[in-house]
């Protein structure tokens, strides 16, 4: 009886730690779009993308060597390549390009369908068969976002909207692939090896696209790049994957739904961007759809 009580206590403690770590991860991710917006106002989007990947890659390499982590097998290289192409290069680059045309507040609306994108790719890649109501919520959420983009009309760039949609699709694919791979390779090790394997591309490209007069770039832009590399691309994932492992993917994964709200608050407070009531309503609508697809899927 006492043994069962002790085990329940340990499980409850682990679950609580998982929620705390997951919350920290989401909180760190929430600064990604505002930080990217600040950076691309003065820096080449390709430089911002490769610099964040290179910074994360160097930090990850140090950690992998320090903890003497085993190298990925040949069978794990292809999934890692998908994570790298989608999550390390694709999503950051496309979102950075999109933020040259739209505000970070506008882009955050699209993050509301990221959990849905991940779930769809989990179905396609993992062979899961969710209930029909899952697809109902998925389609409804997508229509809300598309409708929002269309209704913006001249106040929003079609180029920015399309780039964000493609970015979300790539990110969803990389998340789903990474989730599968983490079962055999480990959570934080997946993102670590992905950014390390990207170094042969990210490091040279960072220097090739670096500004010719770095002294003319504002401190805010450099802080944005540093934040993206250290927190968004690396430390955030360490907390996120640790939280998923401790508290369970299904439960802790719900915390990702808070990201648009945190991001909108940062966009309004740090960038003085206008957050319209429509943005808030659309974000809330998408979150309700994602929650529904999670519950009934």
Outline where the language-model segments fall.
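Transmembrane alpha-helical segments that form core, pore/gating elements
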Residues: 60, 118-120, 124, 138, ...
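Glycine-/small-residue-enriched transmembrane alpha-helix faces in small-molecule transporters
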Residues: 2-50, 93, 153-180, 201
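Hydrophobic transmembrane alpha-helices of multi-pass small-molecule transport proteins
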Residues: 60, 81, 121, 130-152, ...
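Helix-helix packing/entry segments at the starts of transmembrane helices
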Residues: 49-51, 92, 106-113, 177-200, ...
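Juxtamembrane helix-entry segments on the extracytoplasmic side of multipass membrane proteins
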Residues: 14-19, 42-46, 50, 72-78, ...
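C-terminal-most transmembrane helix of multi-pass membrane proteins
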Residues: 2-11, 51-54, 150, 221-223, ...
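Specific transmembrane alpha-helical segments of multi-pass solute transporters/efflux pumps
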Residues: 27-28, 32-33, 61-111, 147, ...
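Small-residue-rich packing faces within the transmembrane alpha-helices of Major Facilitator Superfamily
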Residues: 30, 54-58, 142, 199-200, ...
């Amino acid at each position: 009886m006492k043994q069962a009580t002790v085990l329940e206590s340990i499980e409850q403690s682990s679950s609580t730690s998982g929620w705390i770590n997951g919350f920290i991860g989401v909180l760190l991710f929430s600064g990604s779009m505002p930080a990217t917006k600040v950076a691309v106002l003065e820096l080449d989007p390709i430089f911002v993308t490769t610099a964040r990947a290179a910074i994360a890659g160097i930090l990850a390499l140090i950690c992998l060597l320090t903890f003497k982590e085993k190298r990925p097998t040949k069978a794990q290289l292809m999934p890692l390549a998908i994570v790298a192409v989608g999550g390390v290069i694709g999503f950051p680059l496309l979102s950075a390009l999109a933020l040259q045309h739209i505000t970070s507040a506008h882009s955050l609306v699209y993050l509301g369908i990221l959990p849905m994108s991940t779930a769809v790719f989990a179905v396609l890649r993992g062979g899961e068969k969710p209930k029909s109501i899952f697809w109902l919520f998925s389609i409804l959420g997508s229509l809300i976002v598309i409708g929002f983009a269309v209704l913006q009309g001249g106040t929003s760039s079609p180029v920015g909207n399309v780039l964000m949609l493609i970015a979300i699709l790539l990110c969803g694919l990389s998340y789903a692939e990474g989730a599968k791979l983490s079962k055999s390779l480990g959570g934080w090790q997946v993102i670590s090896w992905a950014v390390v394997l990207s170094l042969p591309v990210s490091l040279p490209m960072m220097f090739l696209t670096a500004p010719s007069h770095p002294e003319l770039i504002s401190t805010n832009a450099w802080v944005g790049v540093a934040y993206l590399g250290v927190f968004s691309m690396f430390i955030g994932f360490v907390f996120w994957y640790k939280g998923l492992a401790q508290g369970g993917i299904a439960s802790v994964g719900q915390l990702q739904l808070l990201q648009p709200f945190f991001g909108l608050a940062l966009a309004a407070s740090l960038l003085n961007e206008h957050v319209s009531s429509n943005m808030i309503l659309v974000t809330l609508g998408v979150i309700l759809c994602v929650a529904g697809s999670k519950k009934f899927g």
